[in-house]
Regions:
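Feature captures C-terminal
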Residues: 1-130
Length: 130
């Protein structure tokens, strides 16, 4: 349970594909900024269900080359319902229709692993350098 040591509640929010890209680009800039003062956090967001092809060396706003959801390019105009824990997962400036649930992260993770017993952390490529 080291990934969610405080065991926060699970929340959902509706994000457009464009917001997903903007949020991930912002996160990549805060992790890989050429300006050391722009580096805030030092980690790439963890996600399951997306595959992001990126070029770390590209300038701010141009690192993400492609984003796939369920094997298809995301539609920047379409709205997707996503789950997350804490506003570090999805900042409050993104999305609409936020909802906090009565289930906490550890319980949700246990339920997910029961339903997906073949899941292994190493078998998902969320972020891929191209």
């Amino acid at each position: 349970y080291n990934i969610a040591p405080m065991n926060p509640p699970v929340s959902t929010v509706e994000l457009t594909g464009g917001e997903i890209k903007e949020m991930l680009e912002e996160n990549l800039e805060r992790s890989f900024s050429c300006n050391p003062l722009g580096q805030m956090g030092g980690y790439v967001k963890r996600c399951l269900g997306l595959q992001v092809n990126l070029r770390i060396e590209n300038p701010k706003g141009h690192r993400i080359q492609e984003i796939y959801y369920k094997g298809r390019h995301i539609d920047f105009e379409k709205t997707y319902k996503v789950s997350f824990v804490t506003t570090q997962g999805v900042a409050s400036k993104y999305g609409k229709n936020r909802k906090k649930y009565d289930i906490n992260a550890v319980e949700a993770m246990k339920d997910y692993l029961k339903e997906n017993s073949n899941f292994a952390p190493g078998n998902k490529e969320s972020f891929r350098l191209v």
